[in-house]
């Protein structure tokens, strides 16, 4: 598993579990808002008044409405 996946999953999982509202910016500039309902290797299910399946390759940026506390894997902890 790559480092990108190692960081991506805990980040999306924290957003999902804590029901943190997010803004998702797509590569074409469109802004989507809602809460992460679920995700897998290829898609994110975003819930607002409706549910939207957003393909990860179309996502540029995910911006949480508040700071997210991540449980970092040991191999990614900063060294002293």
UniProtKB/Swiss-Prot annotation:
What PANTHER family has UniProt attached to this entry? RNA-BINDING PROTEIN HFQ
GO CC aspect terms: cytosol
Determine if Ubl conjugation is one of this entry's keywords: no
Name the keywords, alphabetized.
RNA-binding, Stress response
A Gene Ontology BP annotation from the UniProt entry: regulation of DNA-templated transcription
Which species is this record about?
Answer: Thioalkalivibrio sulfidiphilus (strain HL-EbGR7)
The terms under GO molecular function for this entry are: RNA binding
Q: Taxonomically, what lineage is the organism? A: Bacteria, Pseudomonadati, Pseudomonadota, Gammaproteobacteria, Chromatiales
Show where the Sm domain sits: 9-68
What is the annotated role of this protein in its UniProt record?
A: RNA chaperone that binds small regulatory RNA (sRNAs) and mRNAs to facilitate mRNA translational regulation in response to envelope stress, environmental stress and changes in metabolite concentrations. Also binds with high specificity to tRNAs.
Family per UniProt?
Belongs to the Hfq family.
Pfam families according to UniProt: Hfq
Q: How does it assemble?
A: Homohexamer.
* Keyword RNA-binding assigned: yes
Official protein name in the record: RNA-binding protein Hfq
């Amino acid at each position: 598993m790559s480092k990108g996946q190692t960081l991506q999953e805990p980040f999306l999982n924290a957003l999902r579990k804590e029901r943190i509202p997010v803004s998702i910016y797509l590569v074409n500039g469109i802004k989507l808002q809602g809460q992460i309902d679920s995700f897998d290797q290829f898609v994110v299910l975003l819930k607002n008044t409706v549910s939207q399946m957003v393909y990860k390759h179309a996502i540029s940026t995910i911006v949480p409405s508040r700071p997210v506390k991540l449980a970092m894997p040991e191999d990614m902890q900063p060294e002293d």
